[in-house]
Design a protein with these regions (language model features):
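Acidic, low-complexity, intrinsically disordered interaction modules
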Residues: 5-6
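Hydrophobic helical h-region of N-terminal Sec-dependent signal peptides
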Residues: 19-27
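N-terminal export/targeting and maturation segments
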Residues: 35-96
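Bacterial N-terminal signal peptides that target proteins for export
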Residues: 9-19
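Mature extracytoplasmic domains of secretory-pathway proteins
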Residues: 76-77, 81-139
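C-terminal partner/receptor-binding element of secreted or periplasmic proteins
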Residues: 138-191
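C-terminal motif of bacterial Sec signal peptides marking the signal peptidase cleavage site
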Residues: 29-32
Length: 191
């Protein structure tokens, strides 16, 4: 009888262990799914008016014009990690995809970058002024300079940029390029 009790007791312990492990695994799976969703939400749901968003794109292209002067048309799209206000200045932390194109090469970019950027913005009445554009150093200097120019929460996001976000940026870029090519083709046909 004591042997039967021992087996039953061992079975109960084994059953409790299996249930506990299953619950822990489910919690990890659920938490993992939530963190991915939160990462995307944090990246895409930061409010920024379209006027400022357009100005940021135009300014990034202007700051990098010397790198793209051999291309006919330049485009920039970005994902914003967040903003901070300090001393009447807004610091915008983002990941920028900028590329230059020629009609001859169609949708094949001729130059560009994909990198984290900090843009410093001030407001003058209803207008925004881009005061500064800062990107991290290359190679071994990349992470230290990124962490120096950005809060850790934004630097961490930039260093762990997902393929989903990169694909989203590339998709938006291709939409803009295709629209430009279509417009330039229509202009040529009207002549």
């Amino acid at each position: 009888m004591s042997r039967r009790f021992a087996l039953t007791y061992e079975n109960k312990i084994l059953r409790k262990i299996i249930i506990t492990v299953s619950i822990v695994i489910l919690v990890f799976i659920a938490t993992g799914c939530d963190s991915v969703q939160n990462e995307v939400k944090d990246v895409t749901d930061i409010p920024l008016n379209s006027k400022l968003d357009s100005l940021i794109s135009e300014s990034i292209i202007a700051w990098n014009q010397d790198k793209l002067n051999h291309t006919e048309k330049q485009f920039e799209t970005h994902v914003i990690y967040g903003t901070e206000m300090k001393d009447e200045k807004m610091y915008v932390y983002l990941h920028s995809l900028m590329q230059g194109y020629n009609r001859e090469t169609q949708t094949v970019p001729q130059a560009g970058h994909l990198l984290p950027v900090r843009v410093t913005v001030t407001k003058n009445g209803d207008d925004y002024i881009i005061e500064d554009y800062h990107e991290p150093g290359d190679g071994a200097e990349n992470e230290p300079t990124l962490r120096n120019m950005s809060p850790n929460k934004y630097a961490d996001q930039a260093l762990a940029i997902s393929n989903k976000i990169i694909q989203s940026l590339e998709s938006r870029m291709q939409e803009s390029v295709s629209k430009w090519l279509e417009e330039t083709n229509n202009e040529r046909q009207e002549r």
